[in-house]
Amino acid sequence: MSKKETLWDIAVIGGGASGMMAAITAARTGKTVVLIEHKDQLGKKILATGNGKCNFTNSEMIPEAFRGDQNLFHSIYKQFDRDNTLSFFHEIGVLPKCRKGYYYPASEQALSIQKALEMELTNLGVTIMTGCVPDRIQKADSLKGYLITGAKLDIPAKKVIIATGLLASPNSGSDGSFIPVIKNLGHHFTPVVPALCGFETSGYNPKSAAGVRFEGTVSLFIDHVLVASDRGEIQFTEYGISGIPVFQISRYASVALYEKKQVEAVIDLFPSLSTEELALELKNRFYRPSRYRRNYMQIFNGLLNQKLTACLCEYCGFIPEQKPKEEQYPDAIRVLKDAIKGFRITLTKPRSFEYAQIACGGVRSDEINPGSLESRLWPGIYFSGELLDVDGICGGYNLQWAWSSGYAAGLHASRQIEEEKS
């Protein structure tokens, strides 16, 4: 498909959340916009968010929910914040529904978000090109803009917005295939690693409790220093550990592993009891009349999941079916208490990008104007979304960044065209 006869005001490369927002914002200013997506459908990654329900923003926009370049985040977020996001989606037909601070479409279908964006693009006259793979951007001085080329692709545009994502969830389109094109422009990247993901472990592997989910607290230690912690539903797996609390601290762990540092997760298997309360509970369970003498599995019945109990015994060097003798009780209580409150696992590797919800890292912020997201190397080229060195924890924060950065890139690219006319 050739669009060489048309000089577009703005070409957006990448039809995900941020790219669609950038295209809509630019088109609303009256600019001619073409949106280029190498997959056969726009917004494929949106469809998988929030377990198919699409948690698209959050009521609590706390600074600590965002990692990476905090200054860049604040500069962009104030231009299009949570309230702007809620108003925007309501305007295009998505009634927001809040549950425990998490905003979803009232339909509780991610498809509602994707379709609403797609319909708005169509209503605004944005040209959508799917199945197109651009592989080069070059300056076209005669056009006072850029030429985007690829197989059967030849698109001239005054401004270019790149919203291709990084490497997370490659099947949805974020496969990293455009990163070499960006590097060929002279841009550099901070380390790109998986985030919002589980981790493989070494040493003791809790795979004997694979599939077990439990309320716990995970504390992350990097080179023996506590860096972050989070509480919620943790899951032991065949490969190591997973669950939302693990996802929330994953950025720090992934970056530290990339830097070859020692990374450990210390898990409190029973955070609802203090150390003293747990010691008393264990003492009461061990010290029963002799006729109640039981093995470890029986002692923990009703306290911990059975598979988790077997895993705990294995970790402590006890045989689950063995009945401890009374003289062994004090040591057993101490060892088990310490293990429950401090189950230590060495993390060796994040799960691959295929299993990561996002990637952290991105184009270096010192190569980008923090107010407009315009390249400092190539005026007229803008970046948005996951490509930038900002990422969030679970809870709608990464989609909020997509909306905010897409809006900013689309707005400033449009304004620049207006300024060049005057």
PLM ranges: what are they?
Residues 4-18:
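Beta1/beta-strand and adjacent pyrophosphate-binding region of the FAD-binding site
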Residues 6-8, 150-159, 229-231:
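Core beta-strand elements of the Rossmann-like FAD/NAD(P) dinucleotide-binding domain
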Residues 11, 27-51:
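Glycine-rich FAD pyrophosphate-binding loop
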Residues 11-13, 134, 155-171, 182, ...:
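Short hydrophobic core segments
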Residues 40-42, 47-48, 56-60, 95, ...:
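An anion/pyrophosphate-binding glycine-rich loop and adjacent beta-alpha core
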Residues 51-100:
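Glycine-rich active-site loop/strand segments that organize a redox cofactor
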Residues 130, 309-391:
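A glycine-rich dinucleotide-binding beta-alpha-beta segment and adjacent secondary-structure elements
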